[in-house]
């Protein structure tokens, strides 16, 4: 009866007019929301530019007042030596901060990695505790780290103009340890990408080659640190977001166990998803700097400010150990074919470790495709992407996200139909689509239990071989700009260890050679699908770019992971910076 009345109402001339009005209203609403998004982008760029001008003026003013300062010498110091010289009084905290301000401003001109200057850092110099482990150290922060009075936009219009009311716990701890947070750095829109672009601040580029991605989602950090604009940065990682920028930009980074470092007060685009753990971790030019940062963060202040974090101080004995290690390794996960440079990096590192007295044992976690598709992707999008999509209402979708948002917007039945039709020819794409379906509470509990059981099964595999650590390939070199969003499957080497919640870090070990480049012409991948084709195309013109390996340990063994990374660095690190 109701349907008949509705049909009658819309079938006459008045109904047609009403329908036209509804369509016009919808179009007007869409235009209005897009206009608001354009306005938000314009305001964000203006604030970014004003902040950078303030930053430059502050650095220039200090330079005029201190013409004899040797900034090049200061900027070249490894972080531990820098801290030592500041503590001894040989260098002043002011000289360090303003030297890095000037360098960060210069790096930003070539990479667009800085979103804002945290101008209160100048006043903080007077308040920094002189006994802190990071006394006088300028620290850059991924934009999601909340700082009082500053936006954390995540590249989304809806977050522009909403400054944080207080510092997140990690920023509070950094300040209590004497560090000086001085800039926020760029991220991909919503942080669900391993590229680095958004409609508010634009594209961040790789300091090694401007046509290449710096990685993401901590891409601004990777670019700034690699080019010498920051001695230490903090990022987050839920699928490789610390490890991709570190590998693409040729620096070191570690993703700790999910709850080793506090996440309290961080800005996110999706809250409540716990099946796949987010981690907070440091990024720097060398492993010793990562260790210094973890020493500083794993302190009583953090355990007091966030009692949900296990009170586990940094274990110096494990990190300082020099005993030979039993190292599991695999050349491929059989999901993403390693590039010639990746395979060579892995094998050269393996040989160097063996020559140094370590034992290398073949090892491959079981059932990786299922872990990546059903468990990891299923966990990340257990609501079908509904909460993530809410961030994009009335906003532009950045091209760095590829087709993710369009796919998430498809009806559930259409995703299922496409997955069924694609499975015989494109199994990875079919697995990805089928994992995006929304789940009931009961099905989500089943998924979380399955992830827990998978974690225990891999630990059992690991212990059956009596392994200390594992060495794996790391996706590298850097892909072309906008390519990561079209090569979703290539996250396999990193995403697995978010699903497992194992600490994992990356260390640069070599660079792409002309021979690697020539062999890449024959790269087909294991499946020949669009993801494989994008990887093959997006890694061309890469001679000289850094290539990394990944080092993994069991949960809560960050110190052992760092010890292994330090050994790899000692044996392999090429020790170059982008020009």
From Swiss-Prot:
Substrate binds at residues 191, 217, 238-241. The active site is at residues 142, 217, 241. Keywords: Endoplasmic reticulum, Golgi apparatus, Hydrolase, Lipid degradation, Lipid metabolism, Membrane, Phosphoprotein, Transmembrane, Transmembrane helix. It comes from the Eukaryota. The chain crosses the membrane at residues 9-29. GO terms for molecular function: amidase activity; fatty acid amide hydrolase activity; monoacylglycerol lipase activity. It catalyses: N-(5Z,8Z,11Z,14Z-eicosatetraenoyl)-ethanolamine + H2O = ethanolamine + (5Z,8Z,11Z,14Z)-eicosatetraenoate; (9Z)-octadecenamide + H2O = (9Z)-octadecenoate + NH4(+); 2-(5Z,8Z,11Z,14Z-eicosatetraenoyl)-glycerol + H2O = glycerol + (5Z,8Z,11Z,14Z)-eicosatetraenoate + H(+); 1-O-methyl-(5Z,8Z,11Z,14Z)-eicosatetraenoate + H2O = methanol + (5Z,8Z,11Z,14Z)-eicosatetraenoate + H(+). The modification Phosphoserine is found at residue 241. Pfam families: Amidase (PF01425). It is found in: Endoplasmic reticulum membrane; Golgi apparatus membrane. Its EC number is 3.5.1.99, 3.1.1.-. One of its GO terms (biological process) is fatty acid catabolic process. Residues 30-403, 434-579 are cytoplasmic. PANTHER family: FATTY ACID AMIDE HYDROLASE, FATTY-ACID AMIDE HYDROLASE 1. Belongs to the amidase family. This is Fatty-acid amide hydrolase 1.
């Amino acid at each position: 009866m109701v349907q008949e009345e509705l049909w009658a109402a819309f079938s006459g001339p008045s109904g047609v007019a009403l329908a036209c009005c509804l369509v016009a209203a919808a179009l007007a609403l869409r235009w209005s929301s897009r206009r608001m998004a354009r306005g938000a982008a314009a305001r964000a760029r203006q604030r970014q530019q004003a902040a950078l001008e303030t930053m430059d003026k502050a650095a220039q003013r200090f330079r005029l007042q201190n013409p004899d300062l040797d900034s090049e010498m200061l900027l070249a110091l490894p972080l531990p030596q820098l801290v030592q010289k500041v503590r001894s009084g040989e260098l002043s905290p002011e000289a360090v901060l303003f030297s890095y301000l000037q360098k960060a401003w210069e790096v930003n001109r070539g990479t667009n990695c800085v979103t804002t200057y945290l101008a209160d850092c100048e006043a903080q110099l007077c308040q920094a505790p002189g006994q802190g482990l990071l006394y006088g150290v300028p620290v850059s922060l991924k934009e999601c780290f909340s700082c009082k009075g500053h936006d954390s936009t995540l590249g989304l219009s809806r977050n522009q103009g909403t400054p944080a009311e207080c510092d997140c716990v990690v920023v509070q701890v950094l300040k209590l340890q004497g560090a000086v947070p001085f800039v926020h750095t760029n991220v991909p829109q919503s942080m669900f990408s391993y590229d680095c672009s958004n409609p508010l601040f634009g594209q961040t580029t790789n300091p090694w080659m401007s046509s290449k991605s710096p990685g993401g989602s901590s891409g601004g950090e990777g670019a700034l640190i690699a080019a010498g604009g920051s001695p230490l940065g903090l990022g987050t990682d839920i699928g490789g977001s610390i490890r991709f920028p570190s590998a693409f930009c040729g620096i070191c980074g570690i993703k700790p166990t999910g709850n080793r470092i506090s996440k309290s007060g961080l800005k996110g685009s999706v809250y409540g998803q716990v099946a796949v753990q987010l981690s907070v971790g440091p990024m720097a030019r060398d492993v010793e700097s990562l260790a210094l940062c973890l020493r500083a963060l794993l302190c009583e202040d953090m355990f007091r400010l966030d009692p949900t974090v296990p009170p586990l101080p940094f274990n110096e004995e494990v990190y300082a150990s020099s005993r030979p290690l039993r190292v599991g390794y695999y050349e491929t996960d059989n999901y993403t074919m390693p590039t010639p440079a990746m395979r060579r990096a892995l094998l050269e590192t393996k040989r160097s470790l063996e020559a140094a007295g370590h034992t290398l044992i073949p090892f491959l976690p079981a059932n990786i495709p299922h872990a990546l598709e059903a468990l990891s992707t299923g966990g990340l999008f257990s609501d079908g992407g509904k909460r993530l999509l809410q961030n994009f209402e009335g906003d532009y979708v950045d091209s760095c996200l590829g087709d993710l948002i369009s796919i998430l917007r498809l009806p559930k039945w259409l995703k299922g139909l496409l997955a069924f039709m694609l499975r015989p020819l494109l199994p990875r794409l079919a697995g990805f689509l089928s994992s995006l379906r929304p789940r009931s509470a009961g099905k989500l509990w089943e998924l979380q239990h399955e992830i827990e059981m998978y974690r225990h099964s891999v630990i059992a595999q690991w212990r059956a071989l009596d392994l200390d650590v594992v060495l794996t390939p790391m996706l590298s070199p850097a892909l072309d700009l906008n390519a990561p969003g079209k090569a979703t499957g290539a996250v396999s080497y990193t995403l697995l260890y978010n699903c497992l919640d194992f600490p994992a870090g990356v260390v640069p070990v070599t660079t792409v050679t002309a021979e690697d480049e020539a062999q890449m012409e024959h790269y087909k991948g294991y499946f020949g699908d669009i993801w494989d084709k994008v990887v093959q195309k997006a890694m061309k013109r890469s001679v000289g770019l850094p290539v990394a390996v990944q080092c993994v340990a069991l949960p809560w063994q960050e110190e052992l992971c760092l010890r292994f990374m330090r050994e790899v660095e000692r044996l392999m690190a090429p020790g170059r910076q982008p020009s």
